[in-house]
């Protein structure tokens, strides 16, 4: 009896083990959380990932679009594995003891150089940047890297005092969606617009530009501006290096899909983004570009804006760009 019970128990165990092996679920993918700027163009960059065109057997990218203040607030909390962040955030975070590691460049000036313009109304009396002395400029984020690049161009090319205190112009921060209205109603004399607004303003014929500062920076320093990068934290990299390599691969391939299929991607984001289908292609070519990689020129651009920030009194010192870029970053 005891022998038969033992045999039955052994058989039951073997049967259970075999059943378990036969029905074991596929191992769950590692999750990489990614916080990025809320913008229709960024949805285009991530289109191939979200549509399952670019896949991975190893990781799942969980993305969340955030406004600039939320991105800034998320940096010290380490809420996200990867965060789209300002180039200026790297030395500023280091000053507070927080080290950030660059995985790739996220916003690089488009070859057309149409970003970072100083806009005025078509019938405005202002003809040159010198005419804006004593006038008010509306801006979407005074402390952003994009604005720091603009100020550097105005300082170097137009010899303007760009200090926020007692400078040549009065700078006013206004929520981005309200900038064109502020310009139209005369609340401000000039404005720096976000890319989607600049695209609409240029197409309307109701506004003109006194300075394309991205072009000015290229002329002065020989680099395309880099305003944002994708960053993570050293301890996260150390814990899961292969997962972050896979993240970089997927992001880069998603960018390449968007580059090769701009009409498809543009039409898709136009449905939800309330923007023209042609905007995405124009954004990549003329306004900004999301490399998903790092070039030597990007490193030079980072060091250029940090040196400019030191000159303008924003920073006391600046790091070497090569020291903050991950050794496994995708390189151009």
Where on the chain are the PLM-derived regions?
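Short, solvent-exposed loop/beta-turn-alpha elements that line the ligand-binding surface or hinge
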Residues: 56, 110-111, 215-223, 289-299
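N-terminal export leaders
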Residues: 4-10
């Amino acid at each position: 009896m005891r022998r038969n019970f033992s045999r039955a128990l052994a058989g039951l165990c073997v049967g259970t083990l075999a059943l378990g092996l036969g029905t074991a679920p596929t191992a769950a993918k590692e999750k990489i959380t990614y916080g990025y700027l809320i913008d229709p163009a960024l949805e285009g960059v991530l289109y191939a990932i979200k549509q399952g065109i670019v896949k991975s057997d190893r990781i799942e990218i969980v993305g969340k679009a955030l406004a600039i203040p939320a991105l800034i607030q998320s940096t010290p909390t380490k809420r996200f594995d990867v965060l789209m962040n300002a180039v200026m955030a790297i030395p500023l975070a280091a000053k507070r003891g927080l080290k950030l590691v660059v995985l790739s460049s996220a916003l690089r000036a488009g070859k057309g150089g149409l970003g970072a313009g100083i806009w005025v109304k078509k019938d405005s009396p202002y003809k040159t940047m010198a005419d804006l002395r004593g006038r008010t400029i509306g801006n979407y984020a005074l402390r952003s890297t994009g604005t720091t690049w603009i100020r550097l161009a105005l300082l170097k090319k137009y010899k303007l005092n760009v200090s926020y205190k007692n400078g040549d112009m009065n700078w006013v921060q206004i929520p981005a969606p309200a900038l064109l209205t502020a310009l139209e109603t005369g609340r401000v004399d000039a404005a720096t617009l976000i890319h989607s607004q600049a695209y609409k303003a240029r197409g309307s014929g109701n506004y003109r530009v006194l300075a394309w500062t991205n072009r000015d920076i290229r002329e002065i320093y020989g680099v395309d501006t880099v305003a944002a990068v994708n960053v993570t934290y050293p301890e996260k990299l150390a814990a899961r290096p292969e997962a972050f390599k896979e993240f970089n691969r997927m992001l880069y391939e998603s960018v390449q899909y968007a580059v090769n299929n701009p009409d498809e991607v543009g039409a898709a984001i136009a449905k939800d983004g309330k923007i023209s289908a042609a905007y995405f292609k124009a954004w990549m070519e003329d306004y900004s570009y999301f490399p998903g990689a790092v070039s030597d020129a990007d490193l030079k651009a980072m060091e250029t804006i940090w040196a400019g920030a030191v000159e303008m009194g924003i920073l006391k010192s600046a790091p070497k760009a090569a020291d903050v870029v991950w050794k496994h970053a995708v390189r151009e």
